[in-house]
Amino acid sequence: MSDETIFINRELSWLDFNRRVLALGKDKNVPLAEQVKFLAIYGSNLDEFFMVRVGSLQERANLEQSKSKKEKRENKTNMTAAEQLAAIMPKTAQLQADCDKYYAKALEELAGCGYRKVDFDHLSKEDERFWKKYFQTELFPILSPQIVDSRHPFPFLRNKEIYLGVLLREKHPNAQSLGIIPISSQMERLHFVKKDGETQFALVEELVLHYASSIFGKESILESCLFRVTRNADIDVKEGMMDHDIDYREIMTELLKRRRKLAAVRLQVTPEAAPEVQRLLCSRLELSGKRVFVQKSPLDLSFFYKLTGRIEAEDHPGLFYPAARPMLPPPDYDLTEEVQKHDVLLSYPYQSIRPFIDMLKKAARDPDVISIKMTLYRMARESQIVQALMEAAENGKEVVALVELRARFDEQNNIDWSKQLENAGCTVIYGFDDYKVHSKLTLITRKQADGYSYITQIGTGNYNEKTSELYTDYSFITADEGIGEEASKVFRNLAVQQLTEESDRMLVAPLRFKSVLLDEMDHVIAAARMGRPASMILKNNSISDRDIILKLQEASCAGVRIDMIVRGICCVRAEVPGKTENLHIRSLVGRYLEHGRIYSFFDGVHTRIYIASGDFLTRNTECRVEVGVRVEDPVLVKKLTDILQLQLRDNVNAREMCADGSYQKVKPAEGEPIVNGQMGMYDLLRNDWTREEPWKPTTPKAAPAEAPAAEKQTAAEGPKAKTPEVPVQEPPKAKGPDFVEAASATPAPIHLEPTEHPKGGDHFDELEQMLDKKHLPDQPQKPTVVVTAPKKRGLFSQVLGLFKKRK
């Protein structure tokens, strides 16, 4: 059923995502100070894109060209690395042109609010005297000019630092040289002056550019400009893994040093840059002219963070989002006790991470707790979570911390924390040679009179107090013994570098994540073919996995209504007639960064819902250790379903994909209420901390294909929960004439079953006859397959390849 017309290139899709971020920099519904923050986010996103994605593509293109090898083509749009690079550059140039326009407009509006940027081309005599004196006393003494000529080599240009470039006239006729002044990132970038009742701000690089003649001499300068280099940062960790006797931290530290000197991938210059200066820089940096971007806005927009901090300090609340803080539980709330009654789901940033931190601290001091185990991917600079682990170790408990040192751009922070954890007495492990451990898993083990009890936490987001207030994520906490035992196995396998399929209720990539989700999709497809109103709602950050995309196409053609909420990369086109016409995709980009992953499957009778740390990117499904879990508590199933429905009704932050792959902003129809899927969460989760009735899964029984009507009604009602103030149960309207009526029930009525189904499948007796599958979640488990990590480089990948089912 493969059809190339449904695919979108990964890199071009990412640029479309950054376009959606950039669009918030001009959105009138976004307060002005928040608009300029989005411009800064757009810029930092683009920096990272060039450092990682473009850097990787460039290396691949160079390798294929140098070795005259057959070019490797991307498996969806069939593009080579060189073709992808050729498509990226003009699209980036258009984005930058838009950014320049939005920036100019933002400056006008900031000036109208009393914050004016200094224009060094139009200084009054008084201002000229002030800034010249400031330059001479504060900046001139710390500048380090360099001349590039036959006696002075071209200096190394640091990644993402701004430089002043000056074309100089030599004494000999027609001779020229290049002068370079680093504008160190250690310098104070913004300088503020109060004048005429307003705050003026100046960028240090523009100040140095204006007074360049004070350094080189006015008669010598032919041309001057500012420029900035972006370097490849896609380090290959495997290169340093040949010697297993070397400490892994030392390897990563050395690789980080090496990364600073990788090849240049982009050159940004200001409009004053003469062609000769651009040519000289490209020659020295070995860059194509197609990698030069001339921009009218500052080369680094991160100064907006400091500017908005100044605005906030001077009390201009109207320029910012209204204050919104994570909701705290009642003063007597104890998560350790609450989770003994029923499963708990925390939703960040709407609910505070504080109860989870308090639970860790309590465990660290509880004499009956014997161990705490946790996977750590990105941690805060000042982490109370890590401090709790260290306290537990100092109190004599076994603490195992799996620290992923390869968390990109957080490597040094993780190296530093791993040393502190080790010094505190924790057992620190680093996971696999070939796989990043991206899972968010915590296990607290407690000794009891009759054995052991567990508290397990499985999340979609990092253990990071800072980002828990900025990213939307979900944290599932349970005292379920079966899940605790499986989590214990996961940690045991991680400690000895093994992968296993031995899990019933947890999803653990790479061996048992994608396969389970594909099986769930097959069940829904079979239900649709039987005429049931089957549907799926899939929320994550990105999708690129070809197997999953093709399965979504199959589901759409079978009449399954599919709603996807995909914030970022999306390599599948929605609503393509005859192919994905029942697939509807929207992206939410707003105040908070959407980061949670929820996968909901409705077979026309029952809803089965999962949360997980992994997206639908191929790297998540096949190349990382991810952890997910099916949520079975009826109250939590309803809560997650309500969250999904709220986001499907969002007409503030949402943009919907069209059949050509473009996105259109969703606007409320006439008379339709405004629904903000993010801010509506505060109402949805209000008074959500406790409930009267406990819930525990019952012992699993062989269930009939259809439960009696009265029994289903009782199960569907479940424990009582507060009805959210925001109406979240209204189904989205059908979209156009191609809409298939059989799939029109999304969001379908939810049937909540308190019965435990540990094998991952239930109520599918009729459906299984229609599925050409050798192994379904509710059938007897296959024999355990264990893959042992390699002793030599490369063997791990070879062995794992024997067990991968789909390519």
Indicate where each model-derived feature is located.
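N-terminal localization/anchoring segments of enzymes in phospholipid and broader phosphate metabolism
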Residues: M1-M536, E554, A558, C570-Y592, ...
